[in-house]
UniProtKB/Swiss-Prot annotation:
Protein name: dTDP-glucose 4,6-dehydratase 2
Top-level division of the source organism's lineage: Bacteria
Subunit-structure text: Homodimer.
Pathway it works in: Nucleotide-sugar biosynthesis; dTDP-4-acetamido-4,6-dideoxygalactose biosynthesis; Bacterial outer membrane biogenesis; enterobacterial common antigen biosynthesis
Entry keyword NAD: yes
Native source organism of the sequence: Escherichia coli (strain K12)
CDD domains membership: dTDP_GD_SDR_e
Encoding gene (name): rffG
GO BP annotations, alphabetical order: enterobacterial common antigen biosynthetic process; lipopolysaccharide biosynthetic process; nucleotide-sugar metabolic process; polysaccharide biosynthetic process
Binding site for NAD(+): 12-13, 33-36, 59-60, 81-85, 100, 160-164, 190
Active site: D135, E136, Y160
GO molecular function: dTDP-glucose 4,6-dehydratase activity
Amino acid sequence: MRKILITGGAGFIGSALVRYIINETSDAVVVVDKLTYAGNLMSLAPVAQSERFAFEKVDICDRAELARVFTEHQPDCVMHLAAESHVDRSIDGPAAFIETNIVGTYTLLEAARAYWNALTEDKKSAFRFHHISTDEVYGDLHSTDDFFTETTPYAPSSPYSASKASSDHLVRAWLRTYGLPTLITNCSNNYGPYHFPEKLIPLMILNALAGKSLPVYGNGQQIRDWLYVEDHARALYCVATTGKVGETYNIGGHNERKNLDVVETICELLEELAPNKPHGVAHYRDLITFVADRPGHDLRYAIDASKIARELGWLPQETFESGMRKTVQWYLANESWWKQVQDGSYQGERLGLKG
């Protein structure tokens, strides 16, 4: 049985990973999360009673607390997901992204290195530090049919993606300089259950159900590759346990869609699954409203995920159609979860860009 320390484990992707490990493997999990607005213990409720689950409310920028967590829990692997991750908020307030994504990653690397150096030789060789990153570090695929590969040069275009690119470089440097056994994954856009409603898909679902406008940036022609979060969780565990030290693996869903098409798909599913519309709404798609585009908005992201398929045998199980149906059904069936999120600090806006 491995013990896996997961930073950001109360977040969207992190909680999906925790639920997967507890439900589908025999490994134990220690979640480290400072519970910012996007961290939600309700997302961990399905597994919180497991004897293989532990939770530490700790900021990854707190070196002393991290040292305590490593000493007390003695993990065999670190999976680092703690990050500020919303592009709009990074434009409005980049400082938190620099602090968490760069300084926090540095602090975690140093805590992990000190712990790793004190391990026995067999435990040192088995230890892994898996850093979870984004395809946004590669920049934009404007006017091409190319795909991001593991060797695509970095060209981040937002404060968020620049901070994640910085953290990727730190992780690689800690392997080359100190020998810390690291791996990196870069993923495409995730969606699915327990997604915080500042992001496109849950925001559109909940706005439509409330009869609110569905804001689409620019002309809605921006293209993203969509990855169902439970497919991503399987991929992350696969890389952490079977990936090769020093390697980078791109994880994508093979589902490129224009943003406008995504919103229209949501509207079509709601017509079928939630036919009792809010007062005054004839068709959900009538709520679509085009708004001023995001500054520096990348036109296209698309991932070539052939390496992880070829070398580790991972493939996504959900198509965009099956994953979107599951996602809409989950939000319709779990009103209590998203109502409690909305009752907190978040009030159904695209956070950031306050002018």
